[in-house]
């Protein structure tokens, strides 16, 4: 049985059976469970304030009557976060165009990606032009410039898979910091950009023959998770680009891949000739999932101190101790499963079988998930997910399930 503890929005609810020994009690929320909490606002539906700031506009909200919004960073946090988003827009533009030129029409056709689907990918690249201009304009004249990149895919299927993975962690990275931006106007524009990217990721899943969105909620991750994932694919950047502040964690590797391993790309099943066992479709209800709850997951991880990123100018680091748990970050939850050390920087854990809410049908681990190794199982929720950073030993690893 998988032993796990999920720190979730279900106050006080231990969503998996067989709780690990190290206590990490979930946060309690009044009205859902746990101790009562005194809120400053009484949520009854009746007006707490009789005076409205404008017609048909209840009191409250942030900058709702701002007549001249400022779409610009208000802090170092804003600048560094928006710059990270821009780095992702640049690589996505490069990736979509590179993939379309690397493979011939015949190779795409053989993999089930016909001319209509290729045009969709081409339009995704065009969307990135708008996203790049948007974020660059908000950052101003000192915004980072485009870099040079490297990719390790060699088939159409692995190109689509990497594009789906990249757009997912880019999307999740923005969800992680968006609520914390000081510039609410900049956050509003970035939201309109990242929701477009969410549609890209869904379409790429459909091109893989995957179920388009097998989750109830999308996942948010810290900036350092997104930066750790993108940095290895950046070869070099212009000298005028200032270094980003975000941490690069040691890499985490999947030794035993998900269920489908006897095909050319273990991330999703293919026939030996590269065509999809499940062809591109609006929706595909798979008989066999990519991975299963309770299955063993073998991992290996790098030691800190490795040079990564643009011009190898960033060094991986961690402030954590010995890894004790695998933290599975998916949807609203962080679920901790025990890690059994099997060797030097290697170990085994299990895919948790917990559910999003008690008695719900939604498995927590579904779709594209993020896995990190930690030294302590601390309770975190989507709004304070960054608190996990100081406990990360290695990761994140992008883990496909469902």
Curated annotation (Swiss-Prot):
GO terms for cellular component: endoplasmic reticulum. Induction: When cells are starved for glucose, ammonium, or phosphate, when they are exposed to a carbon dioxide atmosphere, when they are shifted to higher temperatures or when they enter stationary phase. Adenine-repressible. It holds the Pfam family Ferritin_2. InterPro entries: Rds1. May have a function in stress-related responses of the cell. This is Protein rds1. The lineage of its organism: Eukaryota, Fungi, Dikarya, Ascomycota, Taphrinomycotina.
